[in-house]
A protein has these predicted regions:
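Acidic, proline/serine/threonine- and glycine-rich low-complexity intrinsically disordered segments
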Residues: 277-279
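N-terminal amphipathic alpha-helix/helix-capping segment at the start of soluble metabolic enzymes
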Residues: 1-23
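Alpha/beta catalytic cores of nucleotide-metabolism and tRNA/nucleoside-modifying enzymes
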Residues: 1-2, 101, 219-271
Length: 287
């Protein structure tokens, strides 16, 4: 399958045309190459790699070097897919100058297509400065995992009139600052609809209902690869973890029983002095 890679201007164009698209995650070359073979338009190398790939309890421990290390192979594996590089906690909050330096490192050292950072109106000035120097920025509001502890954990946001109004205001502030799209995470469907209608840039929803411009899920969640926890908003479209365990167990059983390897999976060249009698269950060396 061949697909045309999205560009930054395409995001707004898709929204204007009412064209939906999808957005998943990858943290390594192999997964990225699989995503690239699919019809998925956007892939994020998220700081969620801390929890999914490194076993951390939160995303906070992920470093800028970690992100660059994982973004590089995804860019190589998904040349026809728009690649988003996440900015980790502590790499942009200090000042606009720090954010610009960190974003430039990500873009220069990985060749990804944009950076994503978390935060609402409070981050607008930082984003404005980044966009002014030519950095394409994707915003992220609602549940922002890097600051989840201040919300009391990974919980739905915008569940009150005040909270909903703040999300709309945050989205408008980010649009005014120059983001080309905004991730909206874990909010009620009606609130997500209001946010989506309030701005001209696409809203990319994860756990945000059906009215957003783009649906987002973590690949490890939607393919049932992670295993430890599945958010309530995730539908599992395949069960890859189960298939992998079954395959590993089948290999283990055949290797121990002698069913594997058969001659079909062996090098059968005859070497003088080392002839063997081959069966499907054992090899016998000459005495």
């Amino acid at each position: 399958m061949s697909k045309k890679k999205m560009t930054v201007p395409d995001f707004k164009k898709y929204k204007q045309e009412g064209r939906k698209f999808t957005y998943v995650t990858a943290y390594d070359y192999t997964t990225a190459s699989i995503v690239n073979e699919s019809e998925t338009e956007v892939v994020l190398v998220g700081d969620s790699l801390g929890m999914v790939m490194l076993g951390y309890d939160t995303t906070v421990g992920v470093t800028l070097d970690d992100m660059i290390h994982h973004i590089r192979p995804v860019v190589k594996g998904a040349p026809d897919t728009f690649v988003v590089g996440d900015m980790p906690f502590g790499s942009y909050q200090e000042s606009p100058e720090q954010a610009i330096r960190s974003a430039c490192r990500i873009l220069m050292e990985t060749n990804c297509d944009c950076v994503k950072l978390e935060g609402g109106a409070a981050m607008a000035e930082t984003i404005r400065r980044m966009v002014e120097v030519g950095i394409p920025v994707m915003g992220h509001i609602g549940l922002t995992p890097q600051s989840a502890s201040s919300f009391g954990g990974f919980k739905m946001q915008g569940g009150t009139p005040e909270g909903a109004a703040k999300l709309v205001a945050d989205a408008k502030a980010l649009e005014a600052a120059g983001v080309f799209s905004i991730v909206l995470e874990c909010v009620p469907s009606g609130v997500a609809k209001a946010v989506t209608e309030a701005v001209g840039v696409p809203i990319l929803g994860i756990g945000a209902g059906p009215y957003v411009d783009c649906q987002v899920l973590l690949t490890h969640d939607l393919l049932d690869m992670y295993g430890d926890f599945t958010p309530r908003f995730v539908k599992q479209f395949a069960h890859i973890r189960k298939a992998m365990v079954e395959g590993l167990n089948a290999f283990h059983e055949e290797a121990l029983s002698g069913q594997f390897p058969t001659p079909d999976y062996s090098f059968n060249r005859v070497v003088e002095g080392y002839e063997v009698s081959v069966s499907y269950t054992h090899l016998t060396l000459p005495t």
